[in-house]
Amino acid sequence: MADFYQNGIVTTLHNLENRSVEALESELNEFAKKRPLGLILPSLFSELEGKALPATIDHIAKVPYLNEVVIGLDRATKEQYQYALKFFSHLPQQHRVLWNDGPRLQALDEELRKLGLAPKELGKGRNVWYCMGFVLASNRVESVALHDCDILTYDRSLLARLIYPVANPQFNYEFCKGFYARVADGKINGRVSRLLVTPLLRALKHTLGQNDYLEFMDSFRYPLAGEFSFRRDVLNDIRIPSDWGLEIGVLSEMHRNYSHNRLCQSDIADAYDHKHQDLSLNNDQGGLSKMSIDITKALFRKLATQGTVFNTETFRTIKATYFRIALDFIETYHNDAVMNGLKLDIHSEEKAVELFAKNIMKAGTSFLDNPMETPFIPSWNRVVSAKPDVLECLLRAVEEDHKEFLGQ
């Protein structure tokens, strides 16, 4: 049972009564008559062969209020794309699969690259960006949710609670961030959020002083959750990172573009588990190690745009302050786990904190060495300005792929 406490400066919508999914969907059906609703699913082909996504699609097939489902498919051959078309074919909703590795979308990507407007890195950010473009191009929905495809505990109530705040015409929210407790198999998970992001935000407050952005970011209960929902207009202006800083980058864009009362977070699940990344102690180009560097750089970049001046001494102070705060958090999480009959390995927690502390310095050094680094993908408004027919080209490429390969 959740409490009703409002922390920070972003509205929190709680799960106070465990309201039935049928009751939520009944209202969403009515909302969808005036404000059509959609869903974006960024996926790797490998996820089609896993345990999570097939079960997720079975749930989504029962969702009555969706007008469109847009699936972004990465790392797929032609045969795998054809398999994906069949895999998603039992969805009763209007749906399309973006074959991101196919020749038509690759040709469009090359056109944008020549204009300096294509995503620079492969990954979830690029996948999500093209899916957002397709939502704009198809013009079928007014509000859209986005969630990952590796959720092992998926239930369609998650989607209902995620999209409800931007679907209800009596609410004025432009954006909703999902949150949940990362507890599974008798353990507390979510190491990067618990042991990096929250203590780093607190360390930045101590080091740099209070500012609106840090207060905003620290208001989110699970800032790294991959579940969002938006009003359609948001998709035109948002600039998202193509690296592991995606979730932090999206929140930063919401802070830049909208007042706090247009944003909210919603409790979307009692239980949540998905695939876990390796800590990658000896490889800062993979796993949670690379993730921690990219996330930290995303925070530094945002603060720099607000006038914060960084140097090596600043980063050393931030790192030292972070380290002390993070170690204190380990004791807090351990006591919370013990009281709830859960396990928490203090040794592995401290190893993670030590790695993250080192990576704060690596992120700071990279930030100073590459001051012109711009991992952001351009907004769709900018792309349309440079290539006015880009959305029509994107829509045509996806539809032609669908028509050519669906029956083969």
Language-model segments: which ranges?
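Terminal low-complexity segments of carbohydrate-biosynthetic enzymes
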Residues: 1-17, 92, 278-408
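N-proximal low-complexity "stem/linker" segments adjacent to membrane-targeting elements
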Residues: 1-62
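Active-site-proximal specificity loops/subdomain of glycosyltransferases
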Residues: 17-20, 80-140
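Short beta-strand-to-loop acidic/aromatic patch adjacent to the donor-nucleotide binding site
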Residues: 138-152
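Conserved donor-nucleotide/metal-binding helix-loop-beta segment in metal-dependent transferases, i.e.
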Residues: 152-182
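Catalytic donor-sugar/metal-binding loop of nucleotide-sugar-dependent glycosyltransferases
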Residues: 242, 252-271
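Active-site donor/metal-binding and catalytic loop motifs
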Residues: 264-285
